[in-house]
From Swiss-Prot:
Protein name in the entry: Cadherin-4
Organism per entry: Homo sapiens (Human)
GO biological process: adherens junction organization; axon extension; axon guidance; calcium-dependent cell-cell adhesion via plasma membrane cell adhesion molecules; cell adhesion; cell migration; cell morphogenesis; cell-cell adhesion mediated by cadherin
GO cellular component: adherens junction; catenin complex; plasma membrane
Domain text: Three calcium ions are usually bound at the interface of each cadherin domain and rigidify the connections, imparting a strong curvature to the full-length ectodomain.
Function in brief: Cadherins are calcium-dependent cell adhesion proteins. They preferentially interact with themselves in a homophilic manner in connecting cells; cadherins may thus contribute to the sorting of heterogeneous cell types. May play an important role in retinal development.
GO molecular function annotation: beta-catenin binding; cadherin binding; calcium ion binding
Cadherin domain sequence ranges: 170-277, 278-392, 393-507, 508-613, 614-724
Proregion positions: 21-169
Subcellular localization, as worded in the UniProt entry: Cell membrane
Basic residues: bias regions: 129-138
């Protein structure tokens, strides 16, 4: 091909750039409404005729295309009912691409879906066309058939002799069509791309884009030197419907020689996919008795092939229908939309409840010879309508019930209804239309059996009604279908017999109230409390008895019910509440079995003046001087008005001292004041009689005693302590006697204590006069002591070395002391016997003890060093070494004579002369 060749305009066939995104629809359980593609592309010529079809968009609403409408946002294009896009007028497209939006909307749900339509304008020339090239355009040739044609890339023209430069213009290369599923051999050449500059300089060619250097990789390749482009493997339109590549031309140094051009490669569809139903089983329903043409359901099948070609155009048909009753063609299907509708009348749920329809979908526009097919099952359920009125199984029913029974089922009414059980079309509703004007009965529906239960809701008396003839009508909860009339068997008669039973007697007036005055004597006839036996035809006798008579005041005649008093009726009794006394009586007949009824008699007791007033208070206190205070008195009466106040308070004339000492002042009808009449009354307790009289007819009087304590009072009128004692009934002499008794008792207690102390002193003295043979100090006592000092720290060792100082020791407090300690208390003095002292006796006694200790090998210190605990400073004992037992000086033992006769022997031992 040379640069001077003419431009041949190649007419491009209409094809859409489709994207493969169909999934395996057999695994989907739900349908998603919308366009099959989001973006549709088609190649068109620049001149478009009015009504010319450009492409077809495919839309699925999942319920059929019925009610789906299309519109565009361009006035130049419209969409038909089948999705075909066409021009509304003759157009000359000025640009290389036109885009607009197609909208599908459902008129029933008002939902909308959008898709974009792109129209590409192709402008090419061919050297074989015989036409001259147009100015301003480069020659670009594209021929996919071998031998491949050369495609010239645009390049800038040189400046002509007039100094003008042609303007460079980019071109849209016509798409390259590649059939899918090609068997090769591969690589298979598609086209050769060549620049018109390759005669001047060496050029290298390359391609980029999806399918070249982007996944999927290396689907297409190009010879860098010759510019021949190849496809390397079979294509699948369902994976990629189109490819967009860019071709590049550079010199050997990598410098761009030409601008990149766009290459569109479309995979030509082949019918290699069967239609697939969205669901393998479809469920629909239609009312029984529906007219022909009634919509039932929609089945939808999708084909992965190109929907704009016959490969993807699916048509539907019904293969079989089971059962074929009442006709083998009860339904039909719209071949394009998949809508199933009724085609014949006679749908009856009571005969056929469900149909199974096999639907076939075939592509190639339904051509069974060339198209691929698939099937699905449509289950059509015939829904119930109320076209069968309920009918009684019998024209009459009967039952019986004892009188006075309620909530008792008398009879069960059975009905038959051929509609669907336990649905509003089957559930029965019963209604009594005649025979029960008083409303004694109702008919309730058993929810399980649908039977009518005739129930007594209001007690029936055999003596008034012995039988009932009811008329009952039955209907359904749902109204009957149009054109269906009620059956004469929807009404039945019910005969109900009432059985007589022994009814209990009853008191016509219950509770019965009578009024009378209290205090009527026993045997008084009060009233006749009789009962009535409702069993008038049995001629039974009624007997009466008491059931409750708390105070046992009444008696009833067993045959006629006459009530008399058995005791005096007292309104003020504890058995009377609010002036009413209540008793209950029993009336029993002699039927088999006997029946009884109760009646209550209420007696309202009218008050009479039978209770005298009582004075209040019973005790009080008052000052011994009359001008300080007084006692307020009143009265209490068990009766009621007018048999109570105003009261009259007065003092009796006997004894005369009462009126002499006391006086009563009336305050009002209920109160008075009791005060002293004299100027002074000795303190004490006084019983003051007062006569109280009520205002009854006749009036009653009562003499009551009030105990009054008279006592001295302080300035505030309150009794003082002495006064309170005196007011308790003790005189001055009694008080003095009590005080003397208290003093005598205290004196006796003091004497007893002194005697006990003296007895204690004598006991200690006797212990000092015990014989030496009995002295426990001569006994050998073993103590678990290992040295140290005395445990008895209270013992005064100074008395051993300074006995003369004992006379100056102060008296010690009474308590426990040593038996060898001299008492320090006051003692009677005895005359001192003249004695010659024997100062050597004590020395001999000590020396003898020392000798015995030295000769005793068992006595301490065992020739060993003894360590004694330090007893602290201040000890009056001093050092043991201070004891001087070898002194021959005279010792004065005269102080022993001061110890009394009990120590006479000891004084004689140390106070006498020396004995040889």
């Amino acid at each position: 091909m040379t640069a001077g060749a003419g431009v041949l305009l190649l007419l491009l066939s209409l094809s859409g750039a489709l994207r493969a995104h169909n999934e395996d629809l057999t695994t989907r359980e739900t349908c998603k409404a919308g366009f099959s593609e989001d973006d549709y592309t088609a190649l068109i010529s620049q001149n478009i005729l009015e009504g010319e079809k450009l492409l077809q968009v495919k839309f699925s609403s999942c319920v059929g295309t019925k009610g789906t409408q299309y519109e565009t946002n361009s006035m130049d294009f419209k969409v038909g009912a089948d999705g075909t896009v066409f021009a509304t007028r003759e157009l000359q497209v000025p640009s290389e691409q036109v885009a607009f939006t197609v909208t599908a909307w459902d008129s029933q749900t008002a939902e909308k879906w959008d898709a974009v339509v792109r129209l590409l304008v192709a402008q090419t020339s061919s050297p074989h066309s015989g036409h001259k090239p147009q100015k301003g355009k480069k020659v670009v040739a594209l021929d996919p058939s071998p031998p491949p044609k050369d495609t010239l890339l645009p390049w800038p023209q040189h400046q002509n002799a007039n100094g003008l430069r042609r303007r460079k213009r980019d071109w849209v290369i016509p798409p390259i069509n590649v059939p899918e599923n090609s068997r090769g051999p591969f690589p298979q050449q598609l086209v050769r791309i060549r620049s018109d500059k390759d005669n001047d300089i060496p050029i290298r060619y390359s391609i980029t884009g999806v399918g070249a250097d982007q996944p999927p990789m290396e689907v297409f390749s190009i010879d860098s030197m010759s510019g021949r482009m190849y496809v390397t493997r079979p294509m699948d339109r369902e994976e990629h419907a189109s490819y967009h590549l860019r071709a590049h031309a550079v010199d050997m140094n990598g410098n761009k020689v030409e601008n990149p051009i766009d290459l569109y490669i479309y995979v030509i569809d082949m019918n290699d996919n069967r239609p697939e139903f969205i669901n393998q089983v479809y469920n629909g329903s239609v009312d029984e008795g529906s007219k022909p043409g009634t919509y039932v359901m929609t089945v939808t099948a999708n084909d992965a092939d190109d929907s704009t070609t016959a490969n993807g155009m699916v048509r539907y048909r019904i293969v079989t229908q089971t059962p074929q009753s009442p006709s083998q063609n009860m339904f039909t299907i719209n071949s394009e939309t998949g809508d199933i509708v009724t085609v014949a009348a006679g749908l009856d749920r009571e005969k056929v409840q469900q149909y199974t329809v096999i639907v076939q979908a075939t592509d190639m526009e339904g051509n069974l010879n060339y198209g691929l097919s698939n099937t699905a099952t449509a289950i059509i359920t015939v829904t119930d309508v109320n076209d069968n009125p309920p009918e009684f199984t019998a024209s009459t029913f009967a039952g019986e019930v004892p009188e006075n029974r309620v909530e008792t089922v008398v009879a069960n009414l059975t009905v038959m209804d051929r509609d669907q059980p336990h649905s509003p079309n089957w559930n029965a509703v019963y209604r009594i239309i005649s025979g029960d004007p008083s409303g004694h009965f109702s008919v309730r529906t058993d929810p399980v059996t649908n039977e009518g239960m005739v129930t007594v809701v209001k007690a029936v008396d055999y003596e008034l009604n012995r039988a009932f003839m009811l008329t009952v009508m039955v209907s359904n909860q749902a109204p009957l279908a149009s054109g269906i009339q009620m059956s004469f068997q929807s009404t039945a008669g019910v005969t109900i017999s009432i059985m007589d039973i022994n009814e209990a007697p009853y008191f016509p007036s219950n509770h019965k109230l009578i009024r009378l005055e209290e205090g009527v004597p026993p045997g008084t006839v009060l009233t006749t409390f009789s009962a009535v036996d409702p069993d008038r035809f049995m001629q039974q006798a009624v007997r009466y008895s008491k059931l409750s008579d708390p105070a046992s005041w009444l008696h009833i005649n067993a045959t006629n019910g006459q009530i008399t008093t058995a005791a005096v009726l007292d309104r003020e009794s504890l058995y009377t509440k609010n002036n009413v006394y209540e008793a209950t009586f029993l009336a029993a007949d002699n039927g088999i079995p006997p029946a009884s009824g109760t009646g209550t008699l209420q007696i309202y007791l009218i008050d009479i003046n039978d209770n005298a007033p009582e004075l209040l208070p019973k005790e009080a206190q008052i000052c011994e001087k009359p001008n300080l205070n007084a006692i307020n008195i009143t009265a209490a009466d068990a009766d009621v008005d007018p048999n109570i106040g105003p009261y009259v308070f007065e003092l009796p004339f006997v004894p005369a001292a009462v009126r002499k000492n006391w006086t009563i002042t009336r305050l009002n009808g209920d109160y008075a004041q009791l005060s002293l009449r004299i100027l002074y009354l000795e303190a004490g307790m006084y019983d003051v009689p007062i006569i109280v009289t009520d205002s009854g007819n006749p009036p009653l009087s009562n003499t009551s005693i009030i105990k009054v304590k008279v006592c001295p009072c302080d300035d505030n009128g309150d009794c003082t302590t002495i006064g309170a004692v005196a007011a308790a009934g003790l005189g001055t002499g009694a008080i003095v006697a009590i005080l003397i008794c208290i003093l005598i008792l205290l004196t006796m207690v003091l004497l007893f204590v002194m005697w006990m102390k003296r007895r204690e002193k004598e006991r200690h003295t006797k212990q000092l006069l015990i014989d030496p043979e009995d002295d426990v100090r001569d006994n050998i006592l073993k103590y678990d002591e290992e040295g140290g000092g005395e445990e008895d720290q209270d013992y005064d060792l100074s008395q051993l070395q300074q006995p003369e100082a004992m006379g100056h020791v102060p008296s010690k407090a009474p308590g426990v002391r040593r038996v060898d300690e001299r008492p320090v208390g006051a003692e009677p003095q005895y005359p001192i016997r003249p004695m010659v002292p024997h100062p050597g006796d004590i020395g001999d006694f000590i020396n003898e003890g020392l000798r015995a200790a030295d000769n005793d090998p068992t006595a301490p210190p065992y020739d060993s060093l003894l360590v004694f605990d330090y007893e602290g400073s201040g000890s009056t004992a001093g050092s043991v070494s201070s004891l001087n037992s070898s002194s021959s000086g005279d010792q004065d033992y005269d102080y022993l004579n001061d110890w009394g006769p009990r120590f006479k022997k000891l004084a004689d031992m140390y106070g006498g002369g020396e004995e040889d």
